[in-house]
Amino acid sequence: VFIMLLPSGYGQAMAAFVAQNYGAKRMDRANKALFYGIITSLCAGVVTGSLAFFYGDILSSIFSSDMSVILASHSYLKAYAVDCIFTAFLFCFLGYYNGCGSTFFVMIQGVIGAIGVRVPAAFLISQLPDVTLFQIGLATPLSSIVQILLCVIMF
């Protein structure tokens, strides 16, 4: 969860900034903020994602000394690391739409992502033979991709 603090913060800041500019009828500034927010959040996502992908075992060892738990959590964190890239886009878009007052859309795309994509994908992937936590974890970035597509369509 701590890996997602940066993109979450970007999303919240985006909502506040966009709301101010939406109210001032300066969507040019709101759109520019979305662009720069995505770029800088993407840079942060690459750094945190790389840490999780390459050093997830060290991060996991903070919480457990059991090597099987560390290896399993590192496997899952590798999939989570992939999502760090996508959440750079997604959370900025969600902040943008929240700032514009499109909260119903934010809710609907979240439900579609979680219930329509992530849960079914995780279930279906978990049914594969010799499945790993990495493979199951890929349901999360898959969901993010669908949610980003919805955000781009809405834009």
Language model features with spans:
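Structural signal for membrane-spanning alpha-helices in multi-pass inner-membrane proteins
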Residues: 5-8, 52, 95, 121-122, ...
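Alpha-helical transmembrane segments of multi-pass membrane proteins
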Residues: 1-3, 67-93
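Transmembrane helix-loop junction
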Residues: 20, 32, 61-62, 75, ...
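Short membrane-interface helical motifs at transmembrane helix boundaries
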Residues: 47-70, 74
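Residue-level recognition of transmembrane alpha-helices
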Residues: 41, 77-80, 84, 110-111, ...
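Alpha-helical transmembrane segments of multipass membrane proteins
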Residues: 4, 44, 48, 52, ...
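Small-residue-rich hydrophobic transmembrane alpha-helices
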Residues: 1-56, 87-109
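Membrane-interface helix-loop junctions in multi-pass transport and translocation proteins
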Residues: 56, 62, 71, 104, ...
